[in-house]
Regions:
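C-terminal membrane-solvent junction of multi-pass transporters and transport-like membrane proteins
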Residues: 375-384, 418-470, 498-514
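Transmembrane-helix boundary/entry motifs in multi-pass membrane transporters
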Residues: 38-39, 48, 96-135, 157-165, ...
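Helix-loop-helix junctions that connect adjacent transmembrane segments
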Residues: 196, 200-252, 467
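Loop-to-transmembrane helix boundary motifs in multi-pass membrane proteins
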Residues: 117-122, 162-171, 265-297, 365-400, ...
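Cytosolic C-terminal regulatory domains/tails of membrane transporters and channels
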Residues: 1-38, 496-647
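Membrane-interface "cap" regions at the ends of multi-pass membrane proteins
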Residues: 2-63, 112-114, 118-126, 237, ...
Length: 647
């Protein structure tokens, strides 16, 4: 028997997912904080989190210069300069706005979620989560595969590793998984230990390359002749602009930059309920710093590799293909230094998935469990890490650890997320003046127009990428379909949970009347009819929210008395049957009378799943039976009468 507390909000009913695990393995899997809640004890200064973001962003230096050479040849520096301009003038401002408006680690998807209500909004979010999963999962698998490829092409390691790309890739992914099973703090430490030496070694190679260029003026003369063959300055800029989308992988890292915001420490006085201004400022510093470091390295690497790497070397299957800086490290410093550089390139590529793993761990648990579209255990870190490793292992096996085969999907995922972010920011700024910001209305509109231009640039980049690499859309679509399928299956399976977030009794009179009803004192009746029964009746009226796609609901209850009977008004429900079942469990009535419509079960099932209506009487019975099976008690269950409306 349950007695009502004095507080207006009643304690939630127990559920099998809330029960503590009974085994040691279960306790280990659920250890640590929940991923759908902020953990203020696991934050670090933005300078430390920078390396976690940078482990993905900076790792593209392992293959980006080689891709630029293969795609643009002598025009690689021009195309790279345009890429840097798009980064600093487009991506950085966009994600600075995203950081201000979506500071809980949900990225630009949270901004777009509010554009559409109901199932349309849910489908939009799920589709974007599919592209985010494409971006982040392929980041992990492609980077690990490229690390394996670098190891196999190293002259010292090749005799021991040749021909085992897949096994080596899986081993590297397993190592990343072990780090994240240990915790986020360990991941931050490993990221810094990997990234800083890699950047120092890269700067050493590029500085030596620039020195070599100054010693050989003929290299500069040959480069100028190659540029002159493409026309004047206008022609070079136009050609570079057309080639720049092929370098789109150099834009990766920004979505993960905002998705790891929960790890960034803010000011001690940041409000818990409002915008954490200190964390937002720190994240903006992180984004700008990462972009500036990467921009300098991209420009230097494009100039050095274009002038010093011969075309035969960076052609497909050439010794510099996909590893132009590593090729120069061996050529300029010898095998010992070259192998050291290879080792750190392997390390940063192997750990490049760290920011992607962090992003997914902060992204998926904040959406899909809330939508009822993922099992409840996905809110815990260790089960999610193991799930993501399984997905990455399957992707690696499907692609046979082929770096080139995964490149199209990677670029597609990155560009779709950047396009959606730019679109969301432009739309938000366009709407703000209409919301009453009179003094800043014109400035807001001007910024909105600027971000619409940025949106157009990202749209052009995405379309060009899809035309050149259409297989990327196919692979990304498979991820989207996978997310949608898993979401639908989980929503169907979890539909018969109680689905109540909180229950608040609105006024003191209602609380007093509620207390009188609890504990085998009334007969619960969701519909009014003629009954011949002893004892008072409690009539339950349920009002549904407008957005029936929501999974959990905060209920508001008022109670009034009519003669010896009671009327319970429940507002804010997402499903009639689940709400009646929840109220029944709280009141613990003697008898529960339920109606049956006798209409098509198929139609009623769809009405229940999509709109919270349907054959409510039958569904109340099923929900209660499932709840009773999962939470056995010594209490006597109420008698349930299912009565057809036609009888």
């Amino acid at each position: 028997m349950r007695e009502v507390a004095d507080e207006a909000v009643l304690p939630n009913l127990s559920s099998p997912t809330a029960a503590p695990p009974k085994t040691a393995l279960g306790r280990w899997l659920r250890a640590g904080h929940r991923l759908d809640e902020a953990d203020h004890s696991s934050t670090a200064p933005w300078g430390r989190v920078l390396w976690l973001t940078g482990v993905d962003y900076f790792s593209t230096l392992g293959y980006q210069p080689g891709i630029a050479l293969l795609a643009a040849g002598a025009l690689s520096p021009i195309a790279t300069l345009i890429l840097v301009a798009v980064t600093l003038l487009g991506a950085v401002p966009v994600y600075a706005q995203v950081a201000r408006r979506s500071y809980a680690g949900q990225g630009s998807i949270a901004m777009l979620e509010s554009l559409l209500r109901g199932w349309g909004g849910k489908l939009l979010v799920l589709a974007l989560l599919g592209f985010a999963a494409t971006d982040f999962v392929i980041t992990m698998t492609l980077s690990a595969a490229d690390a394996a490829q670098h190891a196999i092409e190293n002259p010292l390691l090749a005799p021991y590793l040749g021909g085992h790309n897949v096994l080596l890739t899986l081993a590297l992914l397993l190592g990343l998984t072990v780090v994240f099973l240990a915790g986020f703090e360990e991941a931050l430490g490993v990221a810094r230990a990997v990234v800083v030496p890699y950047l120092v070694l890269t700067l050493v190679v590029l500085a030596r390359g620039l020195f070599e260029i100054t010693l050989h003026p003929e290299v500069i003369a040959r480069f100028r002749l190659d540029l002159a063959a493409h026309g004047d300055g206008t022609a070079l800029l136009l050609a570079g602009a057309l080639l720049f989308p092929r370098l789109a992988l150099g834009l990766s890292g920004f979505e993960t930059g905002v998705s790891v915001m929960p790890l960034v420490a803010g000011n001690p006085d940041d409000p818990r309920g409002g915008p954490p201004h200190g964390r937002i400022r720190a994240t903006r510093k992180l984004l700008v710093s990462a972009a500036l470091i990467m921009s300098v390295l991209l420009v230097l690497s494009s100039v050095v590799t274009t002038m010093l790497v011969p075309p035969a070397a960076y052609a497909e299957e050439g010794p510099a293909a996909g590893r132009a800086i590593a090729y120069l490290a061996h050529g300029l410093f010898g095998e010992v230094f070259g192998s050291i550089y290879d080792l750190w390139t392997i390390a940063i590529l192997a750990f490049a998935g760290a920011s992607a793993m962090t992003g997914l761990l902060h992204l998926l648990p904040r959406y899909m469990p809330r939508f009822g579209m993922a099992p409840q255990w996905t809110i815990y870190r260790r089960p999610m890490v193991l799930l993501l490793f399984t997905v990455c292992a399957l992707v690696t096996l499907a692609f046979r650890a082929d770096v080139e085969a995964q490149g199209g999907a990677y670029a597609t995922g990155v560009l779709v997320l950047m396009l959606s972010a730019a679109f969301a920011v432009a739309l938000e700024l366009w709407r703000e003046p209409r919301a009453g910001a009179s003094g800043r209305g014109h400035a807001g509109r001007a910024w909105s127009l600027y971000f619409w231009i940025v949106t157009a640039v990202f749209a052009f980049t995405l379309i060009d990428n899809v035309v050149v690499r259409p297989e990327g859309v196919v692979i990304a679509s498979l991820f989207v379909v996978g997310i949608l399928t898993a979401a639908a299956a989980s929503r169907f399976r979890r539909a018969t949970e109680l689905r109540v977030l909180t229950l608040r009794i609105e006024d003191p009179e209602s609380r007093a009347l509620w207390t009188r009803m609890v504990g085998k004192k009334v007969n619960l009746v969701p519909v009014r009819a003629d009954y011949k029964i002893d004892g008072p009746l409690t009539f339950v009226h349920v009002t549904l929210v407008d957005n029936r796609s929501e999974f959990l609901a905060p209920l508001r209850v008022t109670v009034r008395q009519e003669d010896q009977d009671y009327v319970v008004e429940v507002a804010g429900a997402t499903a009639i049957a689940n709400t009646i079942a929840y109220v029944s469990e709280l009141l613990d009535p003697v008898t529960l009378f339920l109606g049956l419509t006798g209409l098509s079960l198929m139609t009623q099932a769809f009405r229940y799943l999509l709109f919270g209506e349907g054959e409510s009487g039958l569904m109340v019975y099923k929900i209660l039976v499932r709840h009773w099976d999962a939470t056995p008690e010594a209490d006597v269950r109420p008698k349930i009468f299912l009565m057809s409306d036609s009888s």
